Structure formats: C-alpha cells, structure tokens
Amino acid sequence: MKAIVTAAGYASRLWPLTKDIPKPLIEVKGKPIVEHIVNKVAEIPDVDEIFIVTNAKFYPLFEQWLIEAKAVAVAVAVGGASAPSVPVKLVNDGTTSNDDRLGQVGDIHLVLEQENVDDDLLVVAGDNLFNFSLLQSYETFLQRQLILNPLYESKSYRAARESGSVVIDEETGEFIEFMEKAQTPKSTLISLGIYFFPQQKLQLIKKYIDEKNNPDKMGFFLMWLMQQEKVIGHVYTEKWFDVGWIEALETARKEFTP
C-alpha cells in the first residue's frame, strides 16, 4: 500500500498565519501537523512508502522539515526506541498560488502518474488531525476491498452543516447520500479527508480527471464516485479536528492526542 498526504493548498482562511508557512507545517503538541499524520499512517503495516505532495512555493520548507524529522528519527532509533521506518518522498506539483493550483484530486492524480503508483492507496488530507488510529478502518478496508472513507460522528448538526455529511446504511456501512455543507443535513456523520482505494479502483481517479470534472475538492469527487462504485464508511467517535480556522487550531492544540 502507498500513501499520499495532500499538502499543496494555500490555506487562505488562516492568513496571515499561513502566508509564509503552509498549514501542514503548523505546530500542534510540539510537532508539525504533517508529522503527526505521517506517524499515524506509518502504523499501518502494509504502507511501504508515503508521498507528500506540496507546491513550489512551500516545497523548500517541507524539504527542511523532512531533513530535521529524519535526523530526529535516527536519534530516537540510536537511543533504543522505535521510530517509523516508512520512506517519505516529497512531490512538487509546480504551482505557486491559488490561481494555478491543481486541486486536491489533481494532486493525487499527479502523484499516481508521476510515481507510477499501482498498489492499494491511502489518501490523507494534510490538515487532518485525529485522536484515533487508522488501523481499524484499514482492517475494514482489507475485509471489504471497497473504497472506504472514514467518518466522524460529530453528534452535531451544526458541525455537519460546515462539512460534508453522509447518510449510510447502518448494516453495510454503504454510503447512501453525501451532502456538502447542507443547510439541513440528514446526518451528523462527517466525511473525513481520508480515503482507502483498492488498487483496481485507482483508474477511477484518472477517469474523473480525464472527464474534466472539478479537481479542486474531494467532496465533488466523492459525489461522482458514488455514482460509479460502492463507497463504505468506518465510523469513529474519537476526536477529529479540521484545522481550517484559528479557533479550530487552538482547540486542536488543547485536545489533540498524538
């Protein structure tokens, strides 16, 4: 299994904080957000390579972070403790601003094509912070061999209005309806920026791009995907943080558990 962390956005909602630093490199509990994500992904035994796709503007900052993170990992290993040994590779999507961005789906497609990925795939958005382990949804994915999108039980219709909410079949976990920031959501289940794809379904990402669909947000892709294939969820109740606003960032700094 390969993993892609999408980190090529420009985070205009967090300006001026993110004017000179990308959102995934903002520190929470002593480490950049992206490092927490990499550590969570590295817990999955089948993941043998992690790609972090970023933009040309912030690529040098990610390079510096990766050099420092590798140095720390070596020091930890020398000290006798265990450290994730999954290789991490940076991918530059060549964009320099919101105006020429490829979009999240476009960035995933770029990595698949450029790196010749032909394996099961895990995608994690680079602004996701969560207290739960991905191992449970990974095990469900292995058993079902279907496209899987982990879900967060927010227990809040207000929170669902601000995100993509999902109605699922309670017995099978299959997606019945997905609503992007609906004014009257039918569910408090929130779609997370995390996706598992079986290898044989990767061609759907290429098909979506080739058909000139909106490459910007995964919500558009998810709605299209539900018309092509079964999509299932795995529900988590442990905390998840959408670090898209200053208030959410402050909450994450208090309540996130590495």
Q: Language model features by range: what are they?
A:
Residues 10, 127-128:
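Active-site metal-binding loops of divalent metal-dependent hydrolases
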Residues 1-5, 10-14, 18, 25:
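N-proximal low-complexity "stem/linker" segments adjacent to membrane-targeting elements
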Residues 34, 111, 127, 166-168, ...:
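Residue-level signal for inorganic ion chemistry
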Residues 128-131, 240:
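A short, conserved beta-strand element in the Rossmann-like catalytic core
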Residues 133-161:
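Conserved donor-nucleotide/metal-binding helix-loop-beta segment in metal-dependent transferases, i.e.
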Residues 138-142, 169-242, 246-258:
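Catalytic-core segments of class I nucleotidyltransferases/pyrophosphorylases
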Residues 2-5, 13, 31-124, 136:
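Conserved N-terminal catalytic core of the sugar/cofactor nucleotidyltransferase
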Residues 20-35:
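Short catalytic helix/loop segments, enriched in acidic residues and glycine
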